[in-house]
Amino acid sequence: MAVKWTGGHSSPVLCLNASKEGLLASGAEGGDLTAWGEDGTPLGHTRFQGADDVTSVLFSPSCPTKLYASHGETISVLDVRSLKDSLDHFHVNEEEINCLSLNQTENLLASADDSGAIKILDLENKKVIRSLKRHSNICSSVAFRPQRPQSLVSCGLDMQVMLWSLQKARPLWITNLQEDETEEMEGPQSPGQLLNPALAHSISVASCGNIFSCGAEDGKVRIFRVMGVKCEQELGFKGHTSGVSQVCFLPESYLLLTGGNDGKITLWDANSEVEKKQKSPTKRTHRKKPKRGTCTKQGGNTNASVTDEEEHGNILPKLNIEHGEKVNWLLGTKIKGHQNILVADQTSCISVYPLNEF
């Protein structure tokens, strides 16, 4: 059972982040921002003027009390010890910001917005050094690659995933998730599958910097490998029965958390699955499509009409959590030395699940 952190918000929580020193921050609808201690006690709270939703929060790794928060078109820089007073703020995006990402050297901050643009802010000189405009719809998620401070990946509701280098204003590589799935989508469909286009909601890069994952509205989880100036899809599997709202690699591992609109949270071992695929002599594009079965999944209350093995394309999850609420944000972090999953959903509380076995 999850431990519930309450008392910090009165509206749905939209985003979470943790500092290296155990502080946590959460942003919610209506401009609410709360800081938490490791025991789930609210330590501070502020409400931004304008009451725009707080869509992304991000601690500075080198200065654990410094916090970045996006609300509306604004990025605020705060001291978590005194949230009422902003240290600085930037208004560089023209539409609502959906996601923030810091590069590893902490001199650049990326902000992705509803216009599809990604603004790259030089934090030392306090000015925009790049405006990356290639997404034709909302840019939902952006992430700098660890160990590569000039490289980032992004995804959006235009169903596109992009690899960028800040040396260039154009993406190095683009894939359209819907087009790439055309061949695989042939054959029998599960109910409602055709109604869900591959709108990309969330992106996460593993600590190595070369493996990243994307979650989309079609319920699929895709894992890519960066190969120089292009990427290759290593895996693509049906991870959820409805849209995948969140993907999140655990720190220093290839364990991948995914959360969906189906109210489920799942843990996958991306590394072992990629290794298995590489050892298989069958090319991805020519693999047999699994036959649909009528078995229900073991150990879960589900109406899925396919077996676990078939639904995930022979990829079995390490852990399944029936959370029961649409997942807004997932965070894997250590609390008091133990790995935990923190979940923000449509409620005003934060759910904490221990990951003792890992």
From Swiss-Prot:
Residues 273-311 are annotated as: Disordered. Residues 295-306 have a biased composition (Polar residues). The keyword rRNA processing does not apply. The keyword Repeat applies. WD repeats lie at residues 1-38, 43-80, 85-123, 127-166, 173-225, 232-270, 314-355. Keywords: Repeat, WD repeat. Belongs to the WD repeat WDR53 family. This is WD repeat-containing protein 53.
